[in-house]
Amino acid sequence: MAETEERSLDNFFAKRDKKKKKERSSRAANAASGAGGSSAAAGSRPGDGGSLGSGARSGDGGSSGSGARSGDGGSLGSGARSGDGGTSRSGDGGSAGPGGKAITKDENEWKEFEQKEVDYSGLRVQAMQISEKEDDDNEKREDPGDNWEEGGGGSGAEKSSGPWNKTALVQAPPAPVTVTETPEPAMPSGVYRPPGARLTTTRKTPQGPPEIYSDTQFPSLQSTAKHVESRNRYLK
């Protein structure tokens, strides 16, 4: 009984191992074929793609199967990594390998862009000449008096005609005002006189002694009383 149980267990594990190995080999073959097709279509790493594709095709018969069963997966691994297609269709891998490497090198290399030098000196001079002409035209438009003198009086008047270019009438300068200064009379030396006394001439009258009995020169209270009485009489 024990032997039969051991055999049944061995058979069971052997079947399970076979199924696992078959699944692994089929997965590896599918992965190799898919990788070979994608590399051949994209053009990247064609050496690896050729080795993988050749390995997948040749592995369908016996190499891949035997390698998977016996555990010797070195041929597939080495063929896929090193791109050595000697065992299966090495011509395909050899023909596509160097061309693909050259293409990848050209793509990876930097191409220096050389900018063409253009001479803009003529354009700059032309632009400066145009700007100078425009400045001259603007100056001629702003100064109609110069055009009048240069054109003889006809062109300037035509250009400056219009209500927006009316020139103000030139006013005659006012006549200068002449200020006449009155000469001052000569002053006698040594004596100061005020301005009012300088113009009036006074005659000197002989002065006699004062009149003591005159009321005008020597007024008194009695004379004022007499004056009041005489006034009252006239009023009555």
Curated annotation (Swiss-Prot):
Compositional bias per record (Basic and acidic residues), positions renumbered to this chain: 1-15, 103-119, 226-236
Keyword terms: Acetylation, Cytoplasm, Phosphoprotein
Tagged with keyword tRNA processing: no
Residues recorded as bearing N-acetylalanine in the entry: A2
Cellular localisation: Cytoplasm
Highest taxon of source: Eukaryota
Chain positions covered by the region annotation Disordered: 1-236
Residue ranges, compositional bias (Polar residues): 214-225
InterPro entries cross-referenced by the UniProt entry: CDV3
Biased composition (Gly residues): 46-100
Species in which this protein is naturally found: Rattus norvegicus (Rat)
Family: Belongs to the CDV3 family.
Residue list for modification Phosphotyrosine: Y120, Y213
PANTHER family (UniProt xref): PROTEIN CDV3 HOMOLOG
Record PTM Phosphoserine, positions in chain: S8, S131, S155
Gene Ontology CC annotation, any one: cytoplasm
Identification of the protein by name: Protein CDV3 homolog
Keyword hit for Methyltransferase: no
Modified positions (Phosphothreonine) in chain numbering: T4, T205
Ranges annotated as biased composition (Low complexity): 27-45
